[in-house]
């Protein structure tokens, strides 16, 4: 089974937006045991789109096209594909009713071009759009490659693919072997060091396979196993995961494509019924914003402090003026007091503090990238950690936040 993915959109071609759909679809297909051989990108031009689709159909069994299903003049995908297949466009009654309701609710008159979103190539199976308006389609061609049409916005593509397209593909293309995969996420170790620690496993890999990926501020490993059924595949992954954890488990913070350090920390706090606050200087609320992006965080995070100026550290948190005068704001003493005072203010179990020099200029004789983190825990003496970071101002702030999260994660692991 050989598949090809085509992304449609001049804005992608010009680099104005990034094509995340192709990566998402490819991952989902791989887990379903469908191999992707080619990725293509084409602008909103009927002639060029026709050529790309014809080429794809000549060399692949399944062609998945995302984008170009909307109501505007440059949305040409379904018209182009219908013409290529020699079929008409027909209306999906349910999709049309949804479009009319949407306009009625908003008190607007529906323009005729919006009907395009409810059309699909005749002979296809329509795919309902739960989060948008443009209907998708799956056309099975007995004499050539099958074609699947998906909308362009990822917020529409992903639920449509997971809920409708993928089950349909699994039913259409049954397989004899089950493909299981697992993503391991690491922080605090570089790709080269991780690969070195696991070099024999990587060099000798057969089944499961190990694929390392260096991402921004972290490294992931994708483990993939082939087996007659899911249970045997998971067993293979469990055995390999245990071997990896025995070597580099200290850096392993979680699993899955959509996981994050913040999500792991928040879930651990929720599970253990512990609370957290923060006092931030150089990160200017970025740590609290990162926590706030995780659903359910309100159960463990009552609020926090952004104390950029020395006066705010003293007036809002109660950091002693003597500490600020003697040690400076970029110091272990200030980081500890920021953490302990903020924890006391909101009566939480933990608090993290961030103070330092994001750059580009030095501060108090300290170069850019000098960062002190403070950690206060109920019933314990506050601690401080010194970081020497490099990069842009935003990179230093982001790395500070992630290091703070990882420090908290490791601390929570020790809490009984």
Curated annotation (Swiss-Prot):
Alphabetical list of InterPro entries matching this protein: CinA (IPR050101), CinA-like_C (IPR036653), CinA_C (IPR008136), CinA_KH (IPR041424), Competence-induced_CinA (IPR008135), MoaB/Mog-like_dom_sf (IPR036425), MoaB/Mog_dom (IPR001453)
Superkingdom in the source lineage: Bacteria
HAMAP family from the UniProt entry: CinA_B (MF_00226_B)
Family: Belongs to the CinA family.
Name under which the protein is recorded: Putative competence-damage inducible protein
Designated gene of the protein: cinA
């Amino acid at each position: 089974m050989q598949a090809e993915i085509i992304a449609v959109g001049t804005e992608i071609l010009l680099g104005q937006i990034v094509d995340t759909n192709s990566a998402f679809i490819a991952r989902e297909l791989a887990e379903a045991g469908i191999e992707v051989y080619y990725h293509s990108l084409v602008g909103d031009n009927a002639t060029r789109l026709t050529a790309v689709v014809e080429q794809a159909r000549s060399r692949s069994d399944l062609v998945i096209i995302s984008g170009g299903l909307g109501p505007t003049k440059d949305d040409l995908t379904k018209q182009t594909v219908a013409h290529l297949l020699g079929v008409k466009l027909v209306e999906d009654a349910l999709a049309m009713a949804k479009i009319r309701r949407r306009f009625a609710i908003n008190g607007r008159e529906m323009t005729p071009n919006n009907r395009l979103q409810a059309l699909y190539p005749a002979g296809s199976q329509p795919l309902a759009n739960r989060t948008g308006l443009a209907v998708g389609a799956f056309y099975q061609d007995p004499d050539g490659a099958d074609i699947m049409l998906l909308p362009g916005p990822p917020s529409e593509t992903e639920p449509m693919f997971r809920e409708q397209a993928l089950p349909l593909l699994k039913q259409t293309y049954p397989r004899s072997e089950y493909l299981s995969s697992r993503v391991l996420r690491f922080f605090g170790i570089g790709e080269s060091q991780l690969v070195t620690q696991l070099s024999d496993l990587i060099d000798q890999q057969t089944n499961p396979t190990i694929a390392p990926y260096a991402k921004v501020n972290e490294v992931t490993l994708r483990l993939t196993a082939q087996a007659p059924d899911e249970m045997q595949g998971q067993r293979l992954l469990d055995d390999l995961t245990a071997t990896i954890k025995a070597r580099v488990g200290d850096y392993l913070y979680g699993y899955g494509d959509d996981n994050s350090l913040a999500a792991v920390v928040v879930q651990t706090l929720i599970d253990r019924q512990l609370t957290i606050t923060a006092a931030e200087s150089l990160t200017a609320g970025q740590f609290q914003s990162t926590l706030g992006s995780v659903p359910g965080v309100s159960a463990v995070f009552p609020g926090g402090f952004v104390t950029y100026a020395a006066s705010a550290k003293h007036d809002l948190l109660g950091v002693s003026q003597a500490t600020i005068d003697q040690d400076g704001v970029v110091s272990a003493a200030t980081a500890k007091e920021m953490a302990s005072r903020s924890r006391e203010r909101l009566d939480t179990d933990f608090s993290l503090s961030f103070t330092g020099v994001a750059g580009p200029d030095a501060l108090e004789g300290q170069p850019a990238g000098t960062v002190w983190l403070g950690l206060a825990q109920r019933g314990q003496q506050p601690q401080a950690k010194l970081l020497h970071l490099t990069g842009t101002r935003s990179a230093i702030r982001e790395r500070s936040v992630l290091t703070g999260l990882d420090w908290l994660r490791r601390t929570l692991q020790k809490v009984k």
